[in-house]
């Protein structure tokens, strides 16, 4: 439930008329519902109860400091894609230990800043980025915790412009190359491999793509563990859809229920990133 509704043709947020807020504060005006944010965050958190987990808010969705502060007080993790987002999360009270650094094109100064505050991990997009992080960590006398973004080559059945998990999409390490890249990373002095990450797309209205991607990742994790490369952090990205017209996207509880059976044998932390919390 979103706490926005129409009453006699007027839009209300948490029983407050938007027109009254506009008259009081002027326009343009952005109105966020605290009750909606809290409800949606708790929906994911509760759905994953029983398994060690970290619910991460994708800061690119809305980096308003008040929104970030609310989520920090809930105990949320944060998925960032820039040094600026890192600073905003910290300024808003977020814990560095709950931050994962995703995204392509991480700059050297951004990597340094993230290492300096000891974030949870980097979601590494490529072999080249891996070597860059190793070099920077070494120059700082630190070890970088990393998770590779693996492209599982799964059709998310969403709009092609927001699909990110197919082989032809330009994100992450190709599934066919992932095992080799993990082996290379395991030899680097300033790298600590902790996890595996994937993001298959946005506005997902079916669960089957998630399940297909998870099955592929779990099979890869078993191969790596047999080689002494332990994966204890699994980051499942991709946005559950919202209703624009007649879509019926799965609820977080339905999503989690579908995953639990497959995750029963995984003894690490499950991280999930979400971006749709602020949408009315």
Indicate where each model-derived feature is located.
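Alpha-helix-loop-beta-strand connector modules within alpha/beta enzyme cores
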Residues: 258-263
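Conserved small/polar residues in nucleotide/adenosyl-binding loops
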Residues: 275-280
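Flexible, glycine/proline-enriched loop segments at strand-loop-helix junctions
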Residues: 117-124, 164-175, 204-210
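Short beta-strand segments
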Residues: 58, 145-151, 197-199, 235-237
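Glycine-rich beta-strand-to-loop/alpha-helix junction loops that act as flexible
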Residues: 200-201, 234-241, 273-274
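Conserved anion-binding
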Residues: 129-188
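Short glycine/threonine-rich loop-to-helix capping motif typified by GTGT followed
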Residues: 206-212, 243-255
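A charged N-terminal "starter" segment
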Residues: 1-144, 183, 187-192, 219-229
